[in-house]
A protein has these predicted regions:
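N-terminal subdomain of nucleotide-sugar transferases
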Residues: 1-47, 68-70
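Active-site proximal beta-strand in glycosyltransferases
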Residues: 4-6, 72-75, 89-107, 128
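A short, charged, and often flexible helix/loop element on the N-terminal side
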Residues: 41-59, 74-76
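Short N-terminal targeting/anchoring amphipathic segment
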Residues: 60-80, 98
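Membrane-proximal helix-turn-helix segments that form the acceptor-binding/catalytic region
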Residues: 61-68, 92-93, 107-127
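A short beta-strand/loop micro-motif in the catalytic core of glycosyltransferases
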Residues: 73-74, 123-132, 150, 181
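Acidic anion/phosphate-binding donor-loop and adjacent secondary structure
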Residues: 139-140, 156-175
Length: 187
């Protein structure tokens, strides 16, 4: 399987840092494990924009112009994928979309916004959540169904931190560790 991997930051740099034990893998949302499962990612070319609309438009054109075939769009967030998701909801973007959703899907008090939002979520095929509570709260919105929501247990990259413990100099145990507070600056 080949996926288009979207992240809201420059990912190649972070992946290179991870390979050199300078960046924890859990921030890469599975990227470091995909190859073990036969998943081959195409990395999105990130570019920062202050405007969310310009950011979404840039991402839209980057994804649409991708020449390499892929089976699925995998996003670490929906932020910046809004145009693609709406196109999927309209049936104009054919690839399935799977994203991490970092908060519960909520119901809006404004009926028009709620209607638009319900349509928007039709453009997301699968969503990954960090807790069962977020899933349960999302189901209450009426915008998503249980079949598209998945609980993924996510935690620290223990291999990364074990490597740091083995390779960083040990603290001198005779001296007590000094705690610094932002209000106690040394001159």
């Amino acid at each position: 399987m080949k996926i288009y991997y979207y992240h809201t930051r420059p990912i190649q740099e972070a992946l290179d840092e991870w390979k050199n034990h300078l960046h924890p893998g859990h921030i890469l949302y599975g990227l470091t494990h995909f190859s073990k499962h036969g998943i081959h990612p195409i990395l999105h070319h990130y570019r920062h924009f202050a405007s969310r609309i310009r950011f979404s438009l840039y991402n839209f054109f980057e994804i649409i112009r991708c020449k390499e075939p892929y089976d699925l769009l995998y996003g670490t967030s929906f932020y910046g994928l809004e145009f693609i998701i709406f196109l999927r909801a309209f049936g104009l973007y054919r690839k399935p979309i799977a994203i991490w959703h970092h908060q519960a899907v909520v119901r809006n008090s404004n009926k028009l916004k709620n209607l638009i939002s319900r349509f928007y979520y039709r453009g997301i095929d699968q969503m990954f959540f960090f807790s069962q509570t977020l899933i349960e709260d999302s189901l209450k919105s009426g915008k998503v169904n249980a079949g598209q929501l998945h609980l993924i247990h996510w935690g620290a990259d223990l291999d990364f931190y074990d490597y740091l413990r083995q390779h960083l100099p040990a603290a001198n145990e005779e001296e007590p560790e000094k705690t610094y507070h932002y209000w106690e600056r040394e001159s």
